[in-house]
Amino acid sequence: MKLTAAALAATALLYGCGGNSGGEKKTTDGKKQIAVVQVMQHGSLDAANQGFLDGLKERGYGADKISVDQQNAQGDQSNLKTIASRFKANRPDLICAISTPAAQAVANEIHDLPIIGCAITDFETAKLVKSNSWPETNVTGVNDRGPVEKQVDMGLKFLPAAKRLGLIYSSSEVNSQIQADQAKAHAASLGLTVVERTVSSVNDIQQAAESMVGQVDFIYVPTDNVIASSIPTLVKVTDPAKIPVFVGADSMAKDGALGSLSVDFYKSGVQAGHMAADVLDGKIKTQDTAVEDPEVLEVIINKKSAETLGLAIPEEYKNAKMVG
């Protein structure tokens, strides 16, 4: 499920989005104030955002009970700091942080309001919690950690003779580094040579991809926000070179990568929404509520990409969700 910019705006209006800056915790109509921050717009994060709101609604927190302040940093770290300061001043009842950078920004600024995170690979490594099983902070939520090893293995299912794995990810995202390290360790165990490229912004993706042509047999991209927002740029280089791309997020496969074994980000958002409702109901506290694993994983294959690359879909993926 993809939440477009227009849909996000409509959702904000539907839920009574407002910029209360007076430090009041609730609006005058008694609704709970929910603040949502998303690092940038791309399919997986948009789906998590919509899922979060739907999860709240399922637990009784619909438009009649909550006022939602939706903020999107558009990939700019300085915007995240401004948004965090806004939330600190407005003091909402609960904050939802979508992505690791968004969660780090609000958690660094705010220590006394509950924060529910989603689309975050590892809360503990990102220093959002003391441990994933016992946070001891004002942050908890749902991680988006998929099975990196099996995601890499997808490449070998399509290309059994492959010897060279390409890795491309953002140098500024700790979530991506975690997964890249896992991928490199797994590649070493399989005897694969790894060619690694990092980017600092979407402007670096084309050059990084071009430098891999002729050097790799297939590429793996983790759940990286920078790359996820520009998959068409990546496959514009890799498709003509007949280099398949396997990814950590469902939206990346929908946008042109060949395949993914991924968290369902919409359902993960719903799961986070349920946790948020439990916080609002006083049933749980963030500091003693373990970070949850995603409940749903799915295999996604882009049929158009497979056809473009001239690759047959392996038998074990015949029942996968087909897109493209």
Please provide the spans of the model-predicted regions.
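An alpha-beta-alpha
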Residues: 34-36, 52, 140-187, 289-305
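Beta-alpha junction/loop-to-helix N-cap segments that form part of ligand/metal-binding clefts
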Residues: 69-130, 221-239, 243, 248
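Pocket-lining segment of extracytoplasmic ligand-binding domains
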Residues: 174-243, 249
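Sec-dependent bacterial lipoprotein signal peptides
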Residues: 1-15
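Bacterial lipoprotein signal-peptidase II cleavage site
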Residues: 16-28
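Extracytoplasmic "Venus flytrap"
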Residues: 29-53, 59, 69-78, 172-173, ...
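Hydrophobic alpha-helical segments within soluble ligand-binding/sensing domains
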Residues: 123-164, 264-284
